[in-house]
Curated annotation (Swiss-Prot):
Swiss-Prot/TrEMBL catalytic activity: 5-methylsulfanyl-2,3-dioxopentyl phosphate + H2O = 1,2-dihydroxy-5-(methylsulfanyl)pent-1-en-3-one + phosphate
Alphabetical list of PANTHER family matching this protein: ENOLASE-PHOSPHATASE E1
Species in which this protein is naturally found: Yersinia pseudotuberculosis serotype O:1b (strain IP 31758)
Cofactor: how and how many bound: Binds 1 Mg(2+) ion per subunit.
Domain of life according to the entry: Bacteria
Function in brief: Bifunctional enzyme that catalyzes the enolization of 2,3-diketo-5-methylthiopentyl-1-phosphate (DK-MTP-1-P) into the intermediate 2-hydroxy-3-keto-5-methylthiopentenyl-1-phosphate (HK-MTPenyl-1-P), which is then dephosphorylated to form the acireductone 1,2-dihydroxy-3-keto-5-methylthiopentene (DHK-MTPene).
Family of the protein in this entry: Belongs to the HAD-like hydrolase superfamily. MasA/MtnC family.
UniProt pathway annotation: Amino-acid biosynthesis; L-methionine biosynthesis via salvage pathway; L-methionine from S-methyl-5-thio-alpha-D-ribose 1-phosphate: step 3/6; Amino-acid biosynthesis; L-methionine biosynthesis via salvage pathway; L-methionine from S-methyl-5-thio-alpha-D-ribose 1-phosphate: step 4/6
UniProt cross-references to InterPro entries, sorted A to Z: Enolase-ppase_E1, HAD-like_sf, HAD-SF_hydro_IA, HAD_sf
Protein name: Enolase-phosphatase E1
């Protein structure tokens, strides 16, 4: 029996175009002036120390680090430091109502239904936990944060690594066979499945013919009773 549902965001709860056409450009445009202005702030300074360690350049100046981060964005690298800085920049956008977090029309109601049924809901995304909370807290369906019991990001590992799903299960204290992971990416689901989880693939566009995972087009097509131990 499924006790816990863990969901991805991009392409799963949220249109990938919102991330790539709204969030990413917003952060890219503001990254350079933001870091120049706030490099001495405690939280930013700590992240820059982590970035110097990540690139093995302990003496890199701020302009070098800015160039590195722009390169990471060009590569769509899942850098924990980059994701944290993007999240801090996005916070301003949400608070100023420059945009609201997109969720597909059926997502909010289905999450609420599962929550009411007593299921525990979590998020696992490459975006920082802070960014996840902002997207759901300022979503176009209202504040969805009360529906979630917790959030995971790349601090537990990359989403295509089996060990990340093992860590999440251990942290939750839940047997893998009671966990269901929702994602649009087959390779992420492969990793979760190898960790013993149940999986379901969200297909918002064309079907993934190379996938062996159950596929649905909407959250309200997910039938939990089909996922048995």
């Amino acid at each position: 029996m499924i006790q816990v549902i863990v969901t991805d965001i991009e392409g799963t709860t949220t249109d990938i175009r919102f991330v790539h056409q709204v969030l990413f450009p917003y952060a890219r445009e503001r990254l350079t002036p933001f870091l120049r202005a706030h490099q001495q702030d405690d939280d930013i300074a700590a992240l820059l120390v982590d970035l110097r360690r990540e690139i093995a350049q302990p003496d890199a100046d701020i302009e070098t680090l800015i160039t590195v981060l722009h390169g990471f964005m060009d590569e769509d690298r899942k850098s924990t430091v980059l994701k944290a800085i993007q999240g801090i920049i996005w916070r301003t956008g949400y608070l100023q109502a420059d945009f609201r977090g997109h969720v597909y029309p059926e997502v909010a109601q289905q999450l609420a239904d599962w929550h009411q049924q007593g299921l525990k809901l979590y998020v696992y995304s490459s975006g920082s936990v802070a960014a996840q909370k902002l997207l759901f807290g300022y979503s176009d369906a209202g504040d969805l944060c009360p529906l979630f019991s917790g959030y995971f990001d790349t601090h537990v590992g990359a989403k295509r690594d089996v060990s990340a799903y093992q860590k999440i299960a251990n942290q939750l204290g839940i047997a893998p066979q009671a966990l269901l992971f929702l994602s649009d990416i087959r390779q992420e689901l492969d990793a979760a499945q190898l960790a013993g989880w149940h999986t379901c693939q969200l297909i918002r566009d064309l079907p993934d013919n190379d996938s062996a995972h159950p596929q649905v087009n909407r959250f309200d097509q997910i039938v939990l009773s089909l996922f048995t131990e």
